[in-house]
Design a protein with these regions (language model features):
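Short juxtamembrane and helix-loop transition motifs at transmembrane-helix boundaries
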Residues: 3-12, 110-116, 140-141
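Long extracytoplasmic/lumenal interhelical loops at the membrane interface
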Residues: 58-121
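Transmembrane alpha-helices of multi-pass inner-membrane enzymes
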Residues: 155-160, 170-203
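Hydrophobic transmembrane alpha-helices and their immediate junctions
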Residues: 123-160
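Hydrophobic alpha-helical segments of polytopic membrane proteins
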Residues: 1-58, 145, 187
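Membrane-embedded alpha-helical segments of multi-pass membrane proteins
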Residues: 22-30, 124-128, 175-184
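Transmembrane-helix signature of polytopic, lipid-linked glycan biosynthesis machinery
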Residues: 8-16, 157-171
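Membrane-interface catalytic loops of GT-C/OST-like multi-pass glycosylation enzymes that act
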Residues: 17-20, 109, 166-178
Length: 203
C-alpha cells in the first residue's frame, strides 16, 4: 500500500509540471532513506535512482522545457542589491523589486529563501538562519530513533529543497511559505524541548 501511495503521489507531482516540488520531494525522500537506513532503504534508494533516470530519459521536457525560468537573473540582481548593504541587510520592511527586461515584469521575491533572508537581514541574519537549520537537522539526526523527529526532519528538508528556487519573502509576515520553513523549525524545537524534559524527569 505504501509503494502504491508513493507511486500515485509521484504521478501527481509529474502531472503538475512543476519542478520545485519534484526537487523538494526527492530531497525529503533521500532524508527518510538515510535516517531510516536498513536493507529496505537500500532497495528504495536503488529504485528511486532508477525511476529518476527513467523520468529524465523518457520525459526530459519536464525538467528542460522551460529552461531555468529566469532564476539566475533573479539571483544575480538580488546579490547585486545585497552588495550595497551586505552585513545588516535592508530591514524586514524593505521592498524588493527585480526587473526582468525580457518579461517586462518586476518580481518582489528572489525565488530563493536564503537570498531573501540575506537581502532583508544581511550576512549576520543569514548566518543565524543557516545555524538554525543546521541545529534543527542535527537534533533530528541525533533523535532519529523517534519517528516524530524523522517526520519533522523530512518536512524541514522538503522546505530547504523548495526554498532553492521559490519564495524569498519569508520573514516580514506569515504566508504560505511558513508551512515549509518556520513551522517545521517550531515543531523540531518543541520536540527537542519535550525530549529534554522527559529525559530530565527520568534521571
Amino acid at each position: 500500500p505504501a509503494l502504491i501511495a508513493a507511486g500515485l503521489m509521484g504521478l501527481a507531482l509529474l502531472a503538475t509540471g512543476s519542478r520545485t516540488p519534484l526537487v523538494a520531494t526527492t530531497l525529503a525522500c533521500a532524508w527518510l532513506i538515510i535516517a531510516c537506513w536498513n536493507k529496505r532503504s537500500a532497495w528504495l534508494l536503488v529504485c528511486g535512482v532508477l525511476v529518476t533516470l527513467a523520468v529524465v530519459r523518457l520525459y526530459p521536457e519536464i525538467l528542460l522545457e522551460r529552461g531555468l525560468s529566469y532564476r539566475p537573473e533573479l539571483w544575480a540582481q538580488t546579490l547585486s542589491k545585497v552588495a550595497q548593504q551586505p552585513w545588516q541587510g535592508f530591514g524586514l520592511d524593505a521592498q524588493l523589486a527585480i526587473l526582468i527586461a525580457d518579461l517586462n515584469t518586476s518580481f518582489s521575491e528572489p525565488h530563493n529563501f536564503a537570498l531573501g533572508v540575506l537581502y532583508y537581514t544581511g550576512i549576520i541574519g543569514l548566518a543565524i538562519w543557516l545555524a538554525m537549520h543546521a541545529l534543527a537537522l542535527f537534533q533530528c539526526w541525533k533523535h532519529r530513533s523517534n519517528y516524530l523527529f524523522i517526520v519533522a526532519g523530512a518536512l524541514l528538508v522538503y522546505g530547504i529543497g523548495a526554498g532553492l528556487t521559490e519564495g524569498g519573502g519569508i520573514l516580514p509576515r506569515p504566508k504560505e511559505h511558513w508551512l515549509v520553513t518556520w513551522i517545521p523549525l517550531a515543531l523540531i524545537a518543541a520536540l527537542s524541548i519535550r525530549t529534554r524534559q522527559t529525559q530530565g524527569a527520568l534521571r
